[in-house]
A protein has these predicted regions:
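Extended catalytic cores of very large enzyme megasubunits
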Residues: 1-957, 964
């Protein structure tokens, strides 16, 4: 146990209890943690999808680190927009310190205000950060998590700092829901949620929406082969999903219990099959935005490979996308033929009846062409009938491939991530060119009840099914794969059942009907770029505090069903993770695709998970282990020992119960301080568990950190690499700033480059930003063409605001008078936003391109002056950089980075393996197989351009016309 000391060496004051001692590392006793920050003001507009103004928040005050995108996202997504009482009063509770008491509306004083001013929204970061940290502290204090009041105060201050400094952040549902009741007395009507009273262990029904918030982002829910009636029925699942989506959470289910197409029903007849039910759930999810108005519903659909409908399921999303393609083609074709027929009718100037095809030969040709191109006869007749009634034109809504458009809205299967569960037995059959059996669900049930082997309904070559998985993933990025055997070999609580599914992003994998609340730590904030050293003690401290926070969140939470409430209470799973690993590696001067990078990733993951379990053991010593610990103790301690063995890079024979040997930490490639901390964390985690057990069945995952990554201003999410060497930063006052990826100069200095060399390399990437020295556009050359000093000054002043040299020479920059009087441009030229002034003054396309590269940069480090060949890999990104870049990180490195982290993660890793458009189906297949052989639990692949909704330029429409 830690000693109770404050920052600066001052001892805490207060009575000694049984809870935890909280160290101060970032704050000082008696000082407001927010006084450490510079605060800025910004106005934030929230717009609807059509661009109309939905809401405006004026004078938002946030720490300066939240300028630009981070502040805009936080204000748009997480500030409470309404219902906050303008005047509050404290609610006294026995044993709760005044500073920690919850608040409620002071209705008497509110009456003195104008009605429209009585309830407002949040506009200050202090309100938001205190709402979160105060709620966690309040619940933790009431239930004995702190040894003394001084420890509770230290925890509150430290958590305020961790969030306000962008060192870490909880998942979105915490921001949406946590603290609305504690800070403002907001209640809201009850929605049917349930919770376990932490004092009595009794199941309770929530009396309002927010007293017990819904802070969990990730849910796994069971579903039975029953249409209605039970809590786990098919229709019951859609209801529970709606409750989760409403409060900003996501959910996943394994649907393998549902009968396949053609299986007999108890009441007679046969089943319509799995897909018919999945379509209903897909529609329901598509109609709901998570958190009310904040984001789309998040959903995972999983199916075992032995389900009789597995082939239809694998094809489902691709088949539906092909329907979208048909709708796009058909709607445009229909409009084209309607226009041609109407034009033939109304442009007819011959003798006879314009509607008689014997008289109007052009109409006959247009109608025949339409029918030949599969326009239904009934539509052609409709065109003629409308023309007879005087219609001159007909308008059809043209579909497009926008994923938010009507085309995608018409089809199913687009509101979920789809995955298949792959057991080792399938991989063995695949390796041995064997067959794979599919089973009716009723047969599996009957065989189990009768103690016999089930009879397959169909058999097929394993390779045939695997090829189908690879092809559809190549074509539309789904399905992903989850390796069932590996997942269950690392299961801490098998006495509670098998792990069947995951949350939408595949990082939370545990028992059905459980939930996980997430938080992520921004790794880059713990790296001192000047000293080139990672602050291990501060990272360990943050892990400890966040483990406590997520555990307290389980304590205070409500859930959408009785079963989830009870099992979440019994197992208390947590999801602590990190982001910005890719950025950290570049700052350290280490290539992403490098054994050193894998060692650093493994060590940091090991420290996080080991420290988190050590804290969980500490909590168990104070509060007791999770209720289902003792019946799973042997299993869990076995898993803990395997984690520890990976930290020590043990031999494969030393692991207990594993089919595949995990990737341990390579001691020769890992910094010694990280390696020592990684080993020490697991020494303490295993020892603490052996003595006290654990408070939580799981503690860590690697989540995608999408929105909260933006709030933390993280360059990279989860374990992803850098995406680009040039970044675009939105400014608080409007506009966009083009900046160098901050990892580039840091890495160059780390690699020993001098300041002058760093400047030259950065100029190569970003450009010089000035005309002087540029080919064909040096001021001396331009002055010969009549450019004045004033105009040249205007051009250079515009460069920070434009991204291309042509834009810097537009008439709006040069001035209409100069353009017309000196450059002999016409009024029409000046008003044409596409007019190429540089071509007008005699520069060739090659000249313009060369000048653009010098002034605005190549966007890539390739070819940079003075850069050593062996250092190129440090700056490789997920995709080639700039117009001329050719290098990018191979997909194998993505898989290996996941494999480096996975042995030290309780759950799994949410990550997409990025592949170029040129990737083959074999590449997809090999990525899945490498993921399995390196002991990853899941793998999702995205080939650039594989989604119909992604713009993919093959050639321009003009080029297409030229080819016609």
């Amino acid at each position: 146990m830690q000693t109770r000391t404050e920052k600066g060496g001052k001892n805490s004051e207060g009575p000694i209890g049984t809870g935890l001692v909280i160290e101060r590392r970032f704050t000082t006793i008696g000082e407001d943690p927010f006084d450490q920050f510079d605060w800025i003001e910004m106005d934030v507009e929230i717009r609807n999808a059509d661009g109309s103004l939905a809401h405006r928040i004026d004078d938002v005050r946030l720490p300066s680190g939240f300028s630009g995108v981070a502040g805009k996202v936080l204000a748009q997504k997480y500030l409470r927009k309404a219902g906050v009482p303008a005047i509050l009063r404290k609610v006294k509770e026995k044993g709760v310190p005044t500073w920690l008491q919850r608040s409620e509306p002071d209705h008497e004083k509110l009456q003195s205000l104008d009605p429209e001013k009585r309830f407002i929204g949040e506009s200050h970061g202090r309100e938001l950060f205190r709402r979160l940290a105060g709620t966690w502290t309040y619940w933790g204090w009431k239930h004995g998590y702190f040894e003394a009041e001084a420890d509770a105060r230290a925890y509150f201050d430290e958590m305020c700092y961790l969030i306000a400094s962008q060192r870490s952040a909880p998942n979105s549902p915490q921001w949406f829901n946590t603290g609305l009741h504690w800070a403002y007395g907001i209640e809201g009507p009850a929605q049917g949620h349930r919770y376990i009273d932490p004092s009595t262990g009794e199941l309770m029904t929530s009396t309002n929406a927010y007293e017990h918030p819904q802070p969990h982002a990730c849910f796994i829910q069971s579903v039975s082969d029953s249409l209605v009636g039970g809590t786990d029925s098919i229709m019951g699942l859609w209801n529970r999903e709606a409750l989760l989506f409403k409060y900003g959470s996501g959910t996943g289910s394994n649907f393998s219990n549902i009968r396949g197409s053609g299986e007999p029903l108890s009441g007679g007849g046969t089943s319509s099959g799995l897909i018919s039910f999945l379509k209903i759930g897909d529609r329901a999810a598509g109609a709901i935005k998570s958190g009310g108005t904040t984001r789309r519903a998040a959903k995972m659909v999983t199916l075992d490979l032995d389900h009789p409908d597995i082939e239809e399921y694998i094809d489902w999303k691709l088949s539906e996308e092909e329907k979208v393609s048909a709708l796009v083609i058909g709607s445009n074709l229909l409009q084209s033929h309607a226009d041609a027929i109407m034009d033939a009718i109304w442009s007819f100037d011959g003798e006879g009846d314009r509607l008689d095809m014997n008289d109007n030969r052009e109409l006959k040709k247009a109608a025949a062409k339409a029918i030949k191109n599969h326009v239904p006869n009934s539509h052609v007749k409709r065109f003629l009938d409308l023309a007879e009634q005087g219609w001159k034109s007909i308008h059809f809504d043209k579909m497009d491939t926008d994923w938010q458009g009507e085309g995608y809205g018409t089809v199913s299967g687009q509101n979920s991530n789809n995955s298949v569960r792959v057991p080792n037995s399938f991989m063995d059959a695949l390796e041995n060119n064997g067959t794979w059996n599919l089973y009716h669900r009723t047969e599996l049930k009957n065989a189990s009840e009768n103690g016999r082997e089930p009879e397959p309904c169909r058999s097929m070559p394993a390779k045939e099914l695997w090829d189908k998985v690879a092809y559809t993933a190549w074509a539309c990025a789904d399905p992903g794969v989850q390796f069932d055997t590996t997942i269950n070999e690392w299961h801490t609580c098998p006495e509670g059942g098998r792990i069947n599914g995951s949350n939408p992003c595949s990082e939370y994998m545990f028992l059905d009907d459980t939930a996980c609340n997430l938080a992520s730590i921004n790794l880059l904030h713990y790296f001192d770029t000047d000293a080139q050293k990672f602050d291990i003690p501060s990272f360990q401290h943050s892990v400890r505090l966040w483990t406590m926070t997520l555990e307290i969140s389980v304590l205070m939470a409500q859930f959408p069903s009785e079963e989830i409430a009870r099992k979440s209470y019994e197992y208390r799973t947590l999801g602590l993770g990190y982001c910005n690993l890719g950025s950290l590696l570049m700052h350290m001067g280490i290539p992403y695709a490098d054994d050193r990078a894998y060692a650093v990733c493994g060590a940091l993951s090991s420290i996080m998970c080991g420290e988190s379990y050590a804290t969980s053991a500490e909590l168990a010593g104070s509060l007791g282990p999770f209720p289902k610990y003792h019946e799973n103790a042997d299993h869990m301690l076995k898993v803990m020992r395997n984690h520890k063995r990976a930290a020590y890079d043990a031999k494969g024979s030393e692991y207990e119960g594993l089919t595949i040997t995990p990737m341990g930490i390579d001691a020769k490639r890992c910094p010694s301080d990280l390696l020592d901390a990684a080993k020490s964390a697991w020494d303490r985690a295993v020892h603490g568990g052996e003595e006290y057990g654990y408070r939580n069945a799981q503690t860590t995952v690697i989540a995608p950190t999408g929105t909260i990554g933006l709030v933390m201003a993280a360059d990279t999410t989860g374990v992803e690499p850098q995406f680009s060497l040039v970044q675009y930063k939105q400014l608080a006052g409007g506009g966009t700033l083009r900046i160098i990826n901050r990892g580039v100069p840091s890495a160059l200095k780390r690699l020993g480059y001098k300041d002058s060399e760093v400047t030259a390399i950065v100029d190569h990437i970003m450009g010089t930003g000035r005309l002087s020295g540029s080919p064909g556009l040096d001021p001396s050359v331009l002055k010969e063409k009549g450019f004045t000093d004033e105009v040249l000054s205007n051009i250079e002043s515009s460069m920070p605001d434009v991204f291309d040299i042509r834009s810097a020479f537009s008439p709006s920059v040069l001035g209409d008078d100069f353009c017309k009087s000196v450059l002999a441009m016409t009024d029409e030229d000046c008003q044409n936003v596409f007019f190429d002034t540089l071509a007008h003054i005699g520069l060739s396309a090659e000249d313009i391109e060369r000048a653009n590269d010098v002034i605005f940069g190549y966007g890539s480090i390739e070819g940079a002056p003075g850069l050593k060949e062996e250092h190129l890999a440090v700056f490789d990104c997920a995709t080639p950089c700039g117009k001329h870049g050719t290098r990018s990180i191979d997909w194998q490195a993505h898989v290996l980075m996941m494999a480096a982290a996975q042995p030290f993660i309780s759950g799994a890793i949410s990550k997409t393996i990025n592949m170029p458009a040129s990737a083959s189906i074999d590449d997809i297949r090999e990525a899945y197989e490498l993921s399995h052989s390196t002991m990853n639990k899941a793998c999702a692949v995205y080939r650039d351009g594989s989604k119909l909704s992604q713009p993919c330029l093959l050639y321009t429409s003009d080029a297409a016309d030229d080819q016609a």
